[in-house]
Design a protein with these regions (language model features):
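Thiamine diphosphate
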Residues: 1-125
Length: 125
């Protein structure tokens, strides 16, 4: 997650760090973006935006809830209101891009890895 990426960037300031995280999990530590910007850490974060707390759906299955009701499913949605990771990152001082296809992802990764300081790529799934 993002806090681990911060730790890695502080431990190895001469290396680029990549953080990979889902949008639901990232919501638990969104303030990490501000820390990345404040400390000018050399991190590129990829947010995999499936617009859901999908990991919690798996946990429902793990505890025997094979077919959750519509209210439970609604509680796992991150689209009301929709999250805008580009806007959130920008408001905390982190450059960000949104990508929806492989070609755009490749270009955004090249930019993120070539640029010093923090950046974020919202990968819309």
């Amino acid at each position: 997650g993002m806090p681990v990426a911060i730790g890695a960037a502080i431990a190895c300031p001469d290396r680029k760090v990549m953080g990979l995280i889902g949008d639901g999990s990232a919501m638990y530590t969104v303030q990490s973006l501000w820390t990345m910007a404040r400390e000018n850490l050399n991190i590129t974060v990829l947010i995999f935006a499936n617009r859901s707390y999908h990991i919690l759906r798996g946990e429902l299955t793990n505890v025997g809830v094979g077919n959750p009701g519509p209210r439970a499913i609604d509680m796992l949605s991150l689209d009301r209101p929709a999250l805008d990771w580009v806007q959130m990152a920008g408001s905390m001082g982190v450059e960000a891009n949104r990508v929806t296809d492989c070609a755009s992802l490749e270009a955004a990764l090249e930019d993120g890895l070539a640029t010093d300081g923090p950046s974020l790529i919202e990968v819309v799934l």
